[in-house]
Every structure is written in structure tokens, then in C-alpha cells.
């Protein structure tokens, strides 16, 4: 987390803008962006953050979530990272000359998507006061879609977690899965330890290789009823409208896809 502020701001209470970067929630970093002109012209504090991405940021598996309680039952780890950063800002930003009662979250593409998901999340209520979603969207996945618990889901999305682990049999996944399915109570903790032992780099490389050959999307935001509304972001926005009635700007950036045209072989 970085805080960027105007000169001589410590004794002031400036508006706070909290930036969530884009990148499909699979890539990107806070350091790509220069907000110096925004800060100079408008006298605001800008907070930029990193958060977990890809399968390390969103990973649904019953051997992990099924054995947990409370927040540990959610697979939306990246969403929790953003919420924790907001909590820290709300508590501490006054020490940097920011107003904890005037926080605007804003993001572009996947960042805009995350803005909308935070508007719909009960866990983020009261942590910000305005929101800007640039080229955001409301896509989310059911737990079954994210895990790939039936054949229809597997055929529709090669990047469902069970399908990835099964296809590539990372560290002997098939063997421990069979034991777990035969007796979930007995082998649940063993299964969980196995999953936690998988090398993070190997997991990322596996997803990267599969992504080259498919237009499937990595199941990112999962409708778990904890960090994300059980019926998805759109339903969550409708449900949160009365509770979280704050100013919102939502739109599409004109040149959103221009960056990708150069690499499109068609």
C-alpha cells in the first residue's frame, strides 16, 4: 500500500482516493500508475494497493473452504485483501492528512469490477463514501462453476480449479482426491495440507499454460454469500442500494480495448 499526497498536507483533512488497478484480476500492479497530476490539481490523497491475483487471489476448493469457519470459508482472497486495505486506510489515513470520512474508491476494468463488488459486499459497508467504476463489469461465478464439480461445468470452463488440478495432476492430486471422496471426514485435513503444499509458482504456471489455449476465464469472483452476494454482484448491488446509498459514477472508457488490438492475430 502506498500513500501519495500533496506537499505540506499533514495538518489538513484532504479527500482520499483509493485506487484499485485493473488487469483481469490476474495481472497488474499499483506501480503502473502516476497520480501526481491528479494530486497536484485537485489536492487529494491517493492510496494505491496491490492485492493477490489469479488462483492465489481467488481459488475455490471444498477441501479448503469446506473445513473452515467465518471469513476462512470464502475463496475471494483478493477481495479480502482490498477490504483489509480499506480498513487500514479508514483507521490511519488521518495521520497522513487524509479525511477518513471522505474516501472514494475508484478502479478501471477489473479494478472497476472490484469497485462494484465492494459496493455489493456486506463486508465493505461503511469503509468508503463514494465510488467510480471505469469499464467495470458484474461477472461472477457460482461455487460449483469455480470448482468444476460436475461434467457440464468442466466442459464449459477448463480453468475450474478441480479441472486444472486433475488434468495436470499437480503433486499427485488424483490420489489424494480419491481418498478424500471415499471418506471426507477422515481425509479432509490431509487433503487440505496437500493443497497448501502445492508450489505457488507451479500453480501459476499451470494456469498460464492452459490460458494460452482457451478463451475460458479463470473463475475469479465467487458467489459464496460471504464476501460476495450469493446471487452475484448485480443482485448484491440491488440488495445494498438501501444500505449503501452513496454517490457512484459508472461508465466505459473509450479506448478500453485498444491496448489489446496489437496482439490480436485476427
Task: Give, region by region, the residue ranges found by the protein language model.
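A short, hydrophobic beta-strand element of the alpha/beta-hydrolase
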Residues: 105, 132-134
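Mature extracellular/periplasmic domains of secretome proteins
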Residues: 35-39, 119-120, 237-239
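Alpha/beta-hydrolase fold nucleophile elbow
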Residues: 89, 96-108
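Glycine-rich nucleophile elbow surrounding the catalytic serine of serine-hydrolase chemistry
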Residues: 25-26, 107-117, 257
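Proline/glycine-enriched tight loop/beta-turn segments at coil->beta junctions
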Residues: 6-16, 28, 100, 241-246
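Cap/lid segment of the alpha/beta-hydrolase catalytic domain
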Residues: 10-12, 20-83, 91-95
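Short beta-strand-to-loop junctions in surface cap/lid or active-site-entrance loops
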Residues: 1-12, 22, 232-242
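Substrate-access "cap/lid" subdomains that shape
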Residues: 91, 116-117, 125, 134-266
